A protein has these predicted regions:
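Extracytoplasmic entry segments of secretory-pathway proteins
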Residues: 2-165, 177, 261-262
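Extracellular/periplasmic metallocenter environments
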Residues: 35, 42-50, 144-262
Length: 262
Protein backbone atom coordinates (compact mmCIF):
# COMPACT_ATOMS: atom_id res chain seq x y z
CA UNK A 1 0.00 0.00 0.00
CA UNK A 2 1.36 3.39 -0.96
CA UNK A 3 0.81 6.30 1.38
CA UNK A 4 0.94 9.77 -0.16
CA UNK A 5 1.99 12.66 1.99
CA UNK A 6 0.95 16.20 1.29
CA UNK A 7 4.12 18.25 1.71
CA UNK A 8 2.07 21.42 2.14
CA UNK A 9 -0.13 19.98 4.87
CA UNK A 10 2.08 21.54 7.60
CA UNK A 11 1.45 25.02 6.25
CA UNK A 12 -1.97 25.73 7.63
CA UNK A 13 -3.29 28.97 6.19
CA UNK A 14 -3.91 31.71 8.73
CA UNK A 15 -6.90 33.84 7.91
CA UNK A 16 -6.23 37.57 8.12
CA UNK A 17 -8.97 40.00 8.98
CA UNK A 18 -9.08 41.02 5.34
CA UNK A 19 -9.69 37.43 4.31
CA UNK A 20 -6.32 36.69 2.62
CA UNK A 21 -4.52 33.56 3.88
CA UNK A 22 -0.93 34.02 5.09
CA UNK A 23 1.20 30.87 5.25
CA UNK A 24 3.41 29.98 8.18
CA UNK A 25 6.42 30.24 5.86
CA UNK A 26 5.50 33.78 4.83
CA UNK A 27 5.07 34.79 8.44
CA UNK A 28 8.43 33.26 9.33
CA UNK A 29 10.12 35.15 6.49
CA UNK A 30 8.54 38.42 7.65
CA UNK A 31 9.69 37.85 11.23
CA UNK A 32 13.19 37.01 10.02
CA UNK A 33 13.31 40.20 7.95
CA UNK A 34 12.19 42.24 10.96
CA UNK A 35 14.87 40.60 13.09
CA UNK A 36 17.55 41.45 10.52
CA UNK A 37 16.44 45.11 10.51
CA UNK A 38 16.50 45.32 14.31
CA UNK A 39 19.88 43.60 14.45
CA UNK A 40 21.22 46.02 11.86
CA UNK A 41 20.03 49.01 13.86
CA UNK A 42 21.58 47.58 17.01
CA UNK A 43 24.88 47.11 15.18
CA UNK A 44 24.72 50.70 13.90
CA UNK A 45 24.20 52.01 17.43
CA UNK A 46 27.01 49.87 18.79
CA UNK A 47 29.50 50.94 16.14
CA UNK A 48 28.68 54.61 15.69
CA UNK A 49 27.60 55.56 19.18
CA UNK A 50 29.04 53.19 21.77
CA UNK A 51 32.14 52.20 19.83
CA UNK A 52 32.70 55.71 18.46
CA UNK A 53 32.46 57.33 21.87
CA UNK A 54 34.85 54.87 23.48
CA UNK A 55 37.46 55.53 20.79
CA UNK A 56 37.51 59.31 21.33
CA UNK A 57 39.05 61.27 24.18
CA UNK A 58 36.86 63.30 26.51
CA UNK A 59 38.00 66.81 27.42
CA UNK A 60 37.28 67.50 31.08
CA UNK A 61 36.41 70.97 32.36
CA UNK A 62 36.60 71.72 36.08
CA UNK A 63 34.65 74.51 37.73
CA UNK A 64 36.18 77.46 39.53
CA UNK A 65 33.85 79.56 41.64
CA UNK A 66 30.86 77.67 40.27
CA UNK A 67 31.79 78.43 36.64
CA UNK A 68 33.51 76.54 33.84
CA UNK A 69 34.86 77.83 30.51
CA UNK A 70 34.33 75.60 27.47
CA UNK A 71 36.10 76.53 24.22
CA UNK A 72 35.08 75.02 20.86
CA UNK A 73 35.74 75.62 17.18
CA UNK A 74 33.97 74.33 14.07
CA UNK A 75 35.99 73.96 10.89
CA UNK A 76 35.21 73.34 7.20
CA UNK A 77 37.47 70.26 7.33
CA UNK A 78 39.51 68.27 9.85
CA UNK A 79 42.87 66.56 10.26
CA UNK A 80 41.66 62.95 10.42
CA UNK A 81 42.87 60.30 7.99
CA UNK A 82 39.43 58.79 7.37
CA UNK A 83 37.13 61.75 6.61
CA UNK A 84 39.34 64.84 6.21
CA UNK A 85 36.77 66.68 4.09
CA UNK A 86 34.01 66.49 6.71
CA UNK A 87 33.10 69.62 8.61
CA UNK A 88 34.02 69.12 12.23
CA UNK A 89 34.26 70.45 15.76
CA UNK A 90 37.35 70.64 17.94
CA UNK A 91 37.46 71.04 21.72
CA UNK A 92 40.23 72.96 23.50
CA UNK A 93 41.95 71.14 26.34
CA UNK A 94 41.99 73.57 29.30
CA UNK A 95 45.22 72.06 30.66
CA UNK A 96 47.33 72.25 27.48
CA UNK A 97 45.35 74.84 25.47
CA UNK A 98 45.68 72.46 22.50
CA UNK A 99 42.80 71.65 20.17
CA UNK A 100 41.57 68.06 20.38
CA UNK A 101 39.63 66.47 17.52
CA UNK A 102 36.76 65.17 19.62
CA UNK A 103 33.17 66.11 20.38
CA UNK A 104 33.10 64.71 23.91
CA UNK A 105 33.50 66.99 26.90
CA UNK A 106 32.48 66.95 30.54
CA UNK A 107 31.30 69.71 32.88
CA UNK A 108 30.24 69.74 36.54
CA UNK A 109 26.57 69.60 37.43
CA UNK A 110 24.74 72.80 38.34
CA UNK A 111 27.53 75.08 37.12
CA UNK A 112 27.53 78.14 34.91
CA UNK A 113 29.02 77.01 31.60
CA UNK A 114 30.64 79.85 29.65
CA UNK A 115 31.11 78.82 26.01
CA UNK A 116 33.43 80.47 23.51
CA UNK A 117 32.80 79.15 20.00
CA UNK A 118 34.99 80.01 17.02
CA UNK A 119 33.20 79.58 13.69
CA UNK A 120 35.51 79.04 10.72
CA UNK A 121 33.13 77.27 8.33
CA UNK A 122 31.27 79.22 5.64
CA UNK A 123 27.73 80.51 5.80
CA UNK A 124 24.65 78.46 4.93
CA UNK A 125 21.17 80.06 5.09
CA UNK A 126 19.06 78.13 7.57
CA UNK A 127 16.21 76.17 6.00
CA UNK A 128 14.00 77.23 8.90
CA UNK A 129 14.75 80.68 10.29
CA UNK A 130 13.29 79.54 13.60
CA UNK A 131 16.80 78.34 14.42
CA UNK A 132 18.12 81.89 14.03
CA UNK A 133 16.69 82.51 17.50
CA UNK A 134 18.91 81.98 20.52
CA UNK A 135 17.21 79.72 23.05
CA UNK A 136 18.24 78.35 26.42
CA UNK A 137 21.25 80.56 27.12
CA UNK A 138 21.35 82.96 30.06
CA UNK A 139 19.32 85.93 28.83
CA UNK A 140 18.51 84.04 25.60
CA UNK A 141 21.32 85.99 23.90
CA UNK A 142 24.80 85.49 22.47
CA UNK A 143 27.61 88.00 22.02
CA UNK A 144 29.12 88.02 18.55
CA UNK A 145 32.23 89.37 16.84
CA UNK A 146 33.32 88.71 13.24
CA UNK A 147 36.76 89.13 11.68
CA UNK A 148 38.20 89.05 8.17
CA UNK A 149 41.38 87.20 7.19
CA UNK A 150 43.49 90.24 8.12
CA UNK A 151 42.16 90.34 11.66
CA UNK A 152 39.94 93.35 11.00
CA UNK A 153 36.81 93.22 13.14
CA UNK A 154 33.70 94.12 11.15
CA UNK A 155 31.17 93.14 13.85
CA UNK A 156 32.19 94.01 17.40
CA UNK A 157 30.75 92.44 20.58
CA UNK A 158 27.16 92.48 19.39
CA UNK A 159 24.82 91.01 22.00
CA UNK A 160 21.70 89.70 20.30
CA UNK A 161 18.81 87.23 20.72
CA UNK A 162 18.79 86.51 16.96
CA UNK A 163 21.39 85.90 14.26
CA UNK A 164 19.15 86.27 11.24
CA UNK A 165 20.40 83.84 8.60
CA UNK A 166 17.86 85.00 6.04
CA UNK A 167 18.66 88.71 6.13
CA UNK A 168 22.38 88.05 5.76
CA UNK A 169 24.58 85.03 5.10
CA UNK A 170 26.20 84.87 8.52
CA UNK A 171 25.35 81.47 10.06
CA UNK A 172 27.24 78.26 9.38
CA UNK A 173 25.67 75.74 11.75
CA UNK A 174 23.74 75.44 14.98
CA UNK A 175 24.89 74.18 18.37
CA UNK A 176 22.00 72.44 20.09
CA UNK A 177 21.61 70.40 23.27
CA UNK A 178 17.94 69.36 22.94
CA UNK A 179 17.89 67.68 26.35
CA UNK A 180 18.27 71.03 28.11
CA UNK A 181 16.46 73.21 25.55
CA UNK A 182 19.62 74.92 24.25
CA UNK A 183 19.66 76.09 20.61
CA UNK A 184 22.33 78.50 19.37
CA UNK A 185 22.95 79.61 15.76
CA UNK A 186 26.70 79.40 15.11
CA UNK A 187 27.92 82.53 13.34
CA UNK A 188 30.24 82.34 10.34
CA UNK A 189 32.29 84.65 8.13
CA UNK A 190 30.12 86.63 5.71
CA UNK A 191 29.31 85.50 2.16
CA UNK A 192 32.32 87.03 0.31
CA UNK A 193 34.76 85.71 2.92
CA UNK A 194 33.03 82.32 2.92
CA UNK A 195 33.41 82.09 -0.85
CA UNK A 196 37.09 82.92 -1.07
CA UNK A 197 39.08 82.92 2.13
CA UNK A 198 38.05 80.11 4.46
CA UNK A 199 40.55 78.29 6.65
CA UNK A 200 41.94 75.28 4.76
CA UNK A 201 43.96 73.49 7.44
CA UNK A 202 42.63 72.22 10.75
CA UNK A 203 42.61 72.94 13.55
CA UNK A 204 42.09 76.48 12.30
CA UNK A 205 43.78 79.51 13.83
CA UNK A 206 42.65 83.12 14.07
CA UNK A 207 45.78 84.29 12.27
CA UNK A 208 45.20 84.68 8.53
CA UNK A 209 41.66 83.26 8.52
CA UNK A 210 38.21 84.86 8.65
CA UNK A 211 36.10 83.70 11.57
CA UNK A 212 33.30 84.50 13.96
CA UNK A 213 33.72 84.50 17.72
CA UNK A 214 30.59 83.78 19.72
CA UNK A 215 30.14 83.64 23.47
CA UNK A 216 27.18 82.53 25.56
CA UNK A 217 26.44 80.93 28.91
CA UNK A 218 24.01 78.38 30.30
CA UNK A 219 23.50 76.47 33.53
CA UNK A 220 24.37 72.79 33.39
CA UNK A 221 21.74 70.33 34.67
CA UNK A 222 21.63 69.68 38.41
CA UNK A 223 21.67 65.92 37.80
CA UNK A 224 24.47 63.89 36.32
CA UNK A 225 23.96 62.39 32.88
CA UNK A 226 25.06 62.35 29.26
CA UNK A 227 23.45 64.93 27.01
CA UNK A 228 23.67 64.69 23.22
CA UNK A 229 24.57 67.83 21.30
CA UNK A 230 24.64 68.34 17.56
CA UNK A 231 24.11 70.61 14.59
CA UNK A 232 20.43 70.70 13.63
CA UNK A 233 20.94 72.51 10.32
CA UNK A 234 20.68 70.02 7.43
CA UNK A 235 23.86 71.14 5.70
CA UNK A 236 25.65 67.85 5.14
CA UNK A 237 26.39 68.42 1.46
CA UNK A 238 26.14 65.31 -0.72
CA UNK A 239 23.99 63.38 1.76
CA UNK A 240 20.26 62.64 1.72
CA UNK A 241 18.35 65.61 3.18
CA UNK A 242 21.66 67.04 4.40
CA UNK A 243 21.32 65.23 7.73
CA UNK A 244 23.71 62.33 7.17
CA UNK A 245 27.48 62.07 7.10
CA UNK A 246 29.14 64.49 9.53
CA UNK A 247 25.81 65.79 10.82
CA UNK A 248 25.09 62.52 12.64
CA UNK A 249 28.63 61.32 13.38
CA UNK A 250 30.37 61.49 16.74
CA UNK A 251 33.66 63.33 16.41
CA UNK A 252 32.33 65.65 13.72
CA UNK A 253 29.05 67.58 14.13
CA UNK A 254 27.51 65.49 16.90
CA UNK A 255 28.84 65.00 20.40
CA UNK A 256 28.07 64.40 24.05
CA UNK A 257 28.24 66.63 27.10
CA UNK A 258 28.87 64.50 30.17
CA UNK A 259 27.50 66.21 33.28
CA UNK A 260 29.26 64.89 36.38
CA UNK A 261 28.31 65.31 40.03
CA UNK A 262 30.32 68.10 41.60
Amino acid sequence: MHVRYDLNACESPVEKRGGDPVSVTARAVSLLAAFVVVAGLATFVAIYFIGGASAMPTVHYAASGGQVNVVLQEDPQNDSASKPDWVSYYVQDPATQKWVHTTLFSVPANARVNVTLYGYDGCTPLRNNYFSQVQGTIGNTVTLSQFDQHGKEYVTDKTTPVINAWSDCNVGHTFAIPGIGLYVPVASPNAPLSANNLCSESPCTTSGNPYAKETFSFISPARAGVFRWQCLVPCGGGFLDGNSGPMQALGYMMGEMDVVSS
